Amino acid sequence: MRAAWLIKMTCAYYAAISETKVKKRHVDPFMEWTQIITKYLWEQLQKMAEYYRPGPAGSGGCGSTIGPLPHDVEVAIRQWDYTEKLAMFMFQDGMLDRHEFLTWVLECFEKIRPGEDELLKLLLPLLLRYSGEFVQSAYLSRRLAYFCTRRLALQLDGVSSHSSHVISAQSTSTLPTTPAPQPPTSSTPSTPFSDLLMCPQHRPLVFGLSCILQTILLCCPSALVWHYSLTDSRIKTGSPLDHLPIAPSNLPMPEGNSAFTQQVRAKLREIEQQIKERGQAVEVRWSFDKCQEATAGFTIGRVLHTLEVLDSHSFERSDFSNSLDSLCNRIFGLGPSKDGHEISSDDDAVVSLLCEWAVSCKRSGRHRAMVVAKLLEKRQAEIEAERCGESEAADEKGSIASGSLSAPSAPIFQDVLLQFLDTQAPMLTDPRSENERVEFFNLVLLFCELIRHDVFSHNMYTCTLISRGDLAFGAPGPRPPSPFDDPADDAEHKEAEGSSSSKLEDPGLSESMDIDPSSSVLFEDMEKPDFSLFSPTMPCEGKGSPSPEKPDVEKEVKPPPKEKIEGTLGILYDQPRHVQYATHFPIPQEESCSHECNQRLVVLFGVGKQRDDARHAIKKITKDILKVLNRKGTAETDQLAPIVPLNPGDLTFLGGEDGQKRRRNRPEAFPTAEDIFAKFQHLSHYDQHQVTAQVSRNVLEQITSFALGMSYHLPLVQHVQFIFDLMEYSLSISGLIDFAIQLLNELSVVEAELLLKSSDLVGSYTTSLCLCIVAVLRHYHACLILNQDQMAQVFEGLCGVVKHGMNRSDGSSAERCILAYLYDLYTSCSHLKNKFGELFSDFCSKVKNTIYCNVEPSESNMRWAPEFMIDTLENPAAHTFTYTGLGKSLSENPANRYSFVCNALMHVCVGHHDPDRVNDIAILCAELTGYCKSLSAEWLGVLKALCCSSNNGTCGFNDLLCNVDVSDLSFHDSLATFVAILIARQCLLLEDLIRCAAIPSLLNAACSEQDSEPGARLTCRILLHLFKTPQLNPCQSDGNKPTVGIRSSCDRHLLAASQNRIVDGAVFAVLKAVFVLGDAELKGSGFTVTGGTEELPEEEGGGGSGGRRQGGRNISVETASLDVYAKYVLRSICQQEWVGERCLKSLCEDSNDLQDPVLSSAQAQRLMQLICYPHRLLDNEDGENPQRQRIKRILQNLDQWTMRQSSLELQLMIKQTPNNEMNSLLENIAKATIEVFQQSAETGSSSGSTASNMPSSSKTKPVLSSLERSGVWLVAPLIAKLPTSVQGHVLKAAGEELEKGQHLGSSSRKERDRQKQKSMSLLSQQPFLSLVLTCLKGQDEQREGLLTSLYSQVHQIVNNWRDDQYLDDCKPKQLMHEALKLRLNLVGGMFDTVQRSTQQTTEWAMLLLEIIISGTVDMQSNNELFTTVLDMLSVLINGTLAADMSSISQGSMEENKRAYMNLAKKLQKELGERQSDSLEKVRQLLPLPKQTRDVITCEPQGSLIDTKGNKIAGFDSIFKKEGLQVSTKQKISPWDLFEGLKPSAPLSWGWFGTVRVDRRVARGEEQQRLLLYHTHLRPRPRAYYLEPLPLPPEDEEPPAPTLLEPEKKAPEPPKTDKPGAAPPSTEERKKKSTKGKKRSQPATKTEDYGMGPGRSGPYGVTVPPDLLHHPNPGSITHLNYRQGSIGLYTQNQPLPAGGPRVDPYRPVRLPMQKLPTRPTYPGVLPTTMTGVMGLEPSSYKTSVYRQQQPAVPQGQRLRQQLQAKIQSQGMLGQSSVHQMTPSSSYGLQTSQGYTPYVSHVGLQQHTGPAGTMVPPSYSSQPYQSTHPSTNPTLVDPTRHLQQRPSGYVHQQAPTYGHGLTSTQRFSHQTLQQTPMISTMTPMSAQGVQAGVRSTAILPEQQQQQQQQQQQQQQQQQQQQQQQQQQYHIRQQQQQQILRQQQQQQQQQQQQQQQQQQQQQQQQQQHQQQQQQQAAPPQPQPQSQPQFQRQGLQQTQQQQQTAALVRQLQQQLSNTQPQPSTNIFGRY
């Protein structure tokens, strides 16, 4: 403390000197002394570090500390300790720059090298001491946290090598036994530190670093939030916690696992979670909802990206850039290199989307399930490899899967897939919904593939269902309907099931599901109503391929069920979803899956008879099928000559009508194909897979047996085709492909065996069977291409079948199809090109030239021979002939070709349209075309002639046209079927037909050419048939409505393959031509229609693509007018899945396909709508602004499946808009976008806020809710696909809308409130935020405007809040917070723009601060929003700070440093003195401010401030009580305060309500002057009384001559400005003898007595060190003259007599507030001073004596003088010392009705916390004081009042009691230091005795006291004797002087007596104080005299001798009064 005082005085001295210089240099003492202290500390630290640093030999400080320290190190440590304590004192006193000092402390630690644990351990307490200061700065806390986390991580890294260190430490240290038992309890939560805590070396380090880190976490979490920094290397991107391997809450704590520790850990975990959320928010720039783990917007973006990748991928080909690997990389990224969090959140959404994509009817293709299974299998393998190590990455998938299944761990995606089944998977609820059925079948197929690829575990699925109770079962038997829905069902699904769930209680349902005991004849008795859905499975001996399943049975099944599709699933509709899934999901029929099969059987059927019956049902249907396959008469090589393999007629199973009749007449014991299929489709998919697996195995065995020569039986091609159909129907796609490839591999051996047996089937059987195989493989080409090995097998097998015909130009249609497929395989798969290039490359071009060459139509008109081949055409199946010869004759004879073509067409068009016959004729023609290539041109020509029949014979084939009426609608279907089969068999190219026949015909009709309409109608019918893919069942049972369609599924598949090969241009040509025809206004149409143009197509809209319903439309649609029919055909074509998919994919790649001069802009847009939304009505163009309505409709109907369509529509609109209308269009798009958001907000769905809460990780909710998959969430991604000009307009409109919502007036008017809430709810939507942020990308010119707009909006919100506009209701306040959050999120999205500009940074920082200051957002009302604002502010501040730390140029460093300081100053100024929890968090972001002392000032009660800012009295002040009121708070620098000195600069009397009054000479003063010896008055200047007496200089042996010096100089008034120049008095010579001894005694010895300069006195009062050594003790002589010349009186108080000699009353000071808290040091009691008197600077040194005097009342003082006199004569009685008790008349007389101004605020700087209440015990300390206890005064310990020449009347104010408390700065530390300010120590408001005070003492007296305190009582007695002897000697000398000058002698003698008594009194007081420090306080008088007059004093001292009293009074009267210089005031 003394050192700090000296530093302060030195600083002030040099500052004063520099003021006098001409060139003034202002030095900041804070920074200057911070640098001095830190520099010195650093030097000492370097010396210590050198010692503790491990030496080259590796001997660290550990070993070296055992020996004695080197001297220089010991000195350095001592210096370090002292200087560090001094720094701590100065830091707490506010004398240092706190920020700089803490930064230096931090840098010291950062410079400690990793190995220097000794040094770290030595310095760690320093860090802990300042930890409470560090957490007040987030910047410093962040750096400190980085240091702690890195050190802790280093300690953990070294744990492995730590054991040896523990041993060595224990061997060298004596400590190991004590800490060893403690770590187990303290480190239980954190096992990684267990070893470290066992080590005495590391234990304190771990605890210390952990403590600091946890302190930062609790007190300054902002320092640990993830941050990004653009430049600064020290403010790194990330969080300090990134470096810590465990959470801070798991770090060790010393208290073990106590309840308190657990409580702290819980709080730590809570804050950790908040830090995580805040960090994620900063990472995404607060752009999305931070509460959700999977942010909706981000996840939606990922999902849409995945969908876009899937849509753009071509699954028909495989090459490097379009393979499954590339698809997987585009969807999941390049391998699992992302962190686990991303895998869990984003991958879940992607996996769910893949499942949806595979299941949804919004996309098409059976390949989707296999693609998803393959993708997930690859992804799973990647993650497995990542987890198990790269060594397992190359393992087989089976090993990985079996490993994962053998262990209890599920496959990676099991949970996600189960969640998908719980929430999003389709289920059967509505029997009328076709889409629902399709999606359910797709789901079964998907999970069939997932189970096959080990991505989904059926076993674990079943176990989960059982554990959850989803498959509750009771008694054995079929499972009854579940009485409850699946608890995991999603809410929306529960709503959908509402209707069915009510039926679940119906007992009849469970009865209807029972299996009849006689189920052995289940399939023979089809009339029974209880045909169970849960068909039994085969026992596990069946090892088939996996099987998807199909919903089941109708209650009343007729033999040919008419409503098959609806009926098969009847019972399932009432079942919970998981019952449906468990029933149908197939399980692979392998040995490893036997457990799952048995488990499924038991779960569904129990273990009794019903399970056996279920098994038996499967066996029965399998037996029936095998009976058909193995019946006699099947293809035996010696009996099959009369059978045409492709058209068996009698044995067909493909639904011929005649065949049906014949079969019904046969005995029922032998099943028909229809019966088998009817039974088959009633099975579940699981059972269907089992059946087909066994049957296909049987067929394969037959063929293998024949190939090996062991059998003569071959299965018929039709039988194989039938099995193909069954497998396809059961969705056993993988099994179907495997079966086909196995058959294909056997075909070459079968062909060789047929040759060996010389069978007639040579060359036909294998090619016919191969054609069926090719048809299947072509149909599932996208599935086949996923497996390269299978592709290679297929290619080799096909080459083996047709190798003999590769070089022939002719061949059967089957061979043509096989060659064409080989060509397609080769060109679509780069893998095959690489493998078979040499073999097939030459042949490839030949195939292209023969099969895929364009053909021109023939226009021949030859002589027609009506009888040519008429018999063959009438019954093709009954005739056998060789195609080769017939083909050759047709090739050579054009007339025969012409006749054959005309006759064939005549039979097709004019016959009775038997479907089978049409099919047979078409196949015959196809076979002949294979052998006669020229027929292709004829077919094309004749079709052109028919379609363009209006061309008047220019197309040829006039004979046919004369006999066929093209307008006859009855043959259109037959002709269309005929053409379709020709195209399927590669006789015609679909493109050629479109180019040559269809387009000309349609355009002719569109141009209204005469008679063109019938041909155009025929063209439409053919095109419709060619573009549609009718999916007929294997057995056509709809006998009542015969339709002409393609009978063989083989041909249907081949036709579909032809559709896939067509180029995109041809498809668009057809669509445009039909559209133009439908739009044309046709003249003379012979057809009328009653319905509207859009109604007819709607009939088809809901009907799906079933071709069998075509007959029902012949009346309603085909007889309509041509334009209506054309529209119907166009819509029907567009409704074909493959057409829509091809068009959309093509348009996405090149949107110019619809840019055609034939189409107008509106037509192109309508055609686009038809392509995009074929099942929806076209837009109505009516209404206002139809363009905007259309755009709005596009945006409103958005969902994830229609993103492509919406984007294409808008892009087409933009492309077709001319430049002059572009602005209008862009504005319409922008406004429509905003309207969509407004409507979304108004609907109450509040999709923004709702959706943000939806995607939780709960198992019961989907990864993305339906709200997020559609509507406004998708607007932003859609706009992002459009040109940037659109985004700019949308951004502008959004900004305008934001501004509309900012004027949120008070909610007084309902309409205004509604508008406000509407706007607010719109603007609070997260999707809207996403939209604006999306548009901002690349829109820099818009960013500035939007930022400015947002700034004004946020400002408006804050202003509205200030105006209390949100306090009326909670709802507006909530909306305001949402709107504010939205705007801040928008700003966050543009934060890089804000940070680029210093001005914008400052503006936004101030605004963000204003948000918090105004209370708009605080921690209590909305903590999430508060942390957003806080983190934004933190990023802005740190971003400014960061730049100056970076490695950029010096100039810009300074500039950025300046910018940072300016910003910090502005924020600090704005913060001001405001106090709240929220603002404390903000203060942490700013640099630590310099500490100041606060002084509270007063003003008269009722003061007002006028318009000019001047204070005036209030109007009603006359009637108000007089007094003072608190006015302002003044800040004073700690460097301006000097203990023991009263500088005039900082403090002003006016601050304390004093009023200047003129001093009146009191009557008592006049009377006293009359008592003077002189006959005249000798007034002297007041300065005379401030000077010490001119005493002679002090010598060792005072010579006699010097005694006259005081007399010589006595009359001279000493100069006021040189108090030290006065000669020493004789009093000094008295003390000479003791002084010599005292000088040699060390000052520190007196500390034992508690009165040394470094300690406080016994009552908490310390001696200021600056006064202990004062050079001039001469002021002792003025002891008697205490009356000050200034009188300060309270208002209305009667002034006491005595005038100028009354003691000056000390003015009241207002208390200070918010002083920095300091710990209470021992021996220092908080007290309250009773008065402060100011000193003139010139009077400083003369005041010393009074500061040294123990404060006693004047009466006592007189008594002491008497005692001193008597003692010298041996007359002193000790009993008289304590006799006097002041009478009550000394009490202060205050005016009635006024309460004294009392304050209990402890105002000292250092002795205790600011505002400490004074303990009441202080009021009873047994020391008397002249100050009245009734009116204690407030004192400011940090300022001194300047004394003015004239007195101030102190205005008395009401009681103003302060009870301010604050916490200590360091609760863990108590410095054994004394406060700096001693004389200003506040004392009790109850009137602490002045005698308690240990006042300032002269150096001689100080030494005297030190000696007295040091020695024992005997030495003290000796001292007293010596002092008495000296007193007698000096008294004699003084008497000689007095005899020479009597007046001077009396004065000197009185002073000597007074001094002697003072010494004795001090001695007694010290003894009493030592005795009373522990003694209880005694009551003290309640009143003491404030003003004492000498006359009055005489009457009060009645116990004294009258003579002595008169003598003293005479001496006093001889001396003029002088001002009091005791800064304690009068005692």
Curated annotation (Swiss-Prot):
Tell me where it resides.
Nucleus
Its gene is: MED12
A GO-annotated cellular component: mediator complex
GO terms for MF? beta-catenin binding; transcription coactivator activity
Q: Where is the region Interaction with CTNNB1 and GLI3? A: 1463-1901
Q: What is the protein name stated in its UniProt record?
A: Mediator of RNA polymerase II transcription subunit 12
The reply on keyword Nucleus is: yes
Family, according to the entry, reads as follows: Belongs to the Mediator complex subunit 12 family.
- The annotated regions of Basic residues compositional bias extend over 1631-1640
Q: Which residues carry this modification: N6-acetyllysine?
A: K1645
Question: Where does the record place the modification Asymmetric dimethylarginine?
Answer: R1746, R1844, R1865
Q: Name one GO biological process term.
A: positive regulation of transcription by RNA polymerase II
Q: Which residues carry this modification: Phosphoserine?
A: S482, S512, S545, S547, S1105, S1116
Disordered as annotated region, ranges: 170-191, 474-516, 538-563, 1088-1113, 1241-1262, 1297-1321, 1585-1676, 1805-1848, 1965-1999, 2008-2027
Per UniProt, the keywords (alphabetical) are: Acetylation, Activator, Methylation, Nucleus, Phosphoprotein, Repressor, Transcription, Transcription regulation
Domain of life of the native organism: Eukaryota
